[in-house]
């Protein structure tokens, strides 16, 4: 099973960013593993260079940790926590 959840190209970089490479991220679910355990798949790659990015196969525990880190970062920049 593979199912895409969300994706977004991010080309609007803030001024002053020195390593200004526009990237795209995608989140999917996949269970194409020897143990058939579903995992969250996070892909980050440079826009226009499909297939050359980094892919993280996250267990539910690691996906929750990433979710918590993103929530905490949003709070740090003044956004309300969900």
Task: Give a label for each model feature.
Residues 1-82:
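Positively charged, low-complexity terminal tracts
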